[in-house]
A protein has these predicted regions:
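Short Pro-Cys-Gly-centered "Cys-loop" motif that presents a nucleophilic cysteine in a tight turn
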Residues: 1-12, 18-51, 56, 65-188
Length: 188
């Protein structure tokens, strides 16, 4: 196993992501997405604060405040458990993920804010939906009050706005130049 270049240190924010081996799917049906979210709760209860997330057919994104010292081990256990389950369910063999998960330390609040937009707009960028709120497997619906959730803690971000509608406006106001601020923090 290769050594992680970004050490995960409790008390910091990270963009955590990974994709399918050879960019193949990691989620094949609705139940897979829900199962993965249940696994997140199982492996990371009291170990992280989930700021936002998005599960895409062939990759995932989490923006987290890490609270534990054994995050990498927990993430490895989660990935292995999920991969074994998918391989068994679909009669597959081999790697599900393209190597170890990636982690980018978030350097400031502006990057944290803009990364939430990037993560929530991922299904739109991927042409899976026309509007971010139409994608079921992201935390955006919790952010704008369309769904009550227990996984994300949107107040970390929403407290920067007078009301969630301002956050909605922030999301839809995305311009290509906003990507420049965060490009070093996203999928390689």
């Amino acid at each position: 196993m290769t050594r992680r270049t970004t050490q995960i240190v409790a008390g910091n924010y990270y963009h955590i992501y990974n994709r399918g081996n050879q960019r193949d799917r990691i989620f094949f049906e609705r139940e897979n997405y829900l199962y993965f979210l249940r696994k997140i709760r199982q492996y990371f209860r009291d170990a992280v604060v989930v700021i936002c997330y998005c599960l895409m057919p062939n990759h995932f994104h989490f923006l987290l405040l890490v609270l534990c010292d054994d995050f990498s081990r927990r993430m490895q256990n989660l990935s292995n458990s999920y991969a074994k389950s998918i391989n068994k369910r679909y009669n597959r063999v081999g790697h599900l993920f393209q190597g170890n998960f990636k982690a980018k330390l978030i350097s400031n609040d502006a990057v944290l804010l803009h990364l939430t937009r990037y993560i929530h707009l991922n299904p739109v960028f991927g042409k899976l939906v026309r509007r971010a709120e139409d994608w079921e497997f992201s935390s955006y619906r919790e952010y704008i009050g369309l769904r009550k959730g227990t996984l994300p803690e949107p107040d970390v971000i929403l407290d920067q706005f007078k009301e969630f509608r301002e956050y909605q406006e922030f999301i839809v106001s995305y311009q290509e130049e906003h990507f420049e601020m965060i490009k070093e923090y996203v999928l390689e």
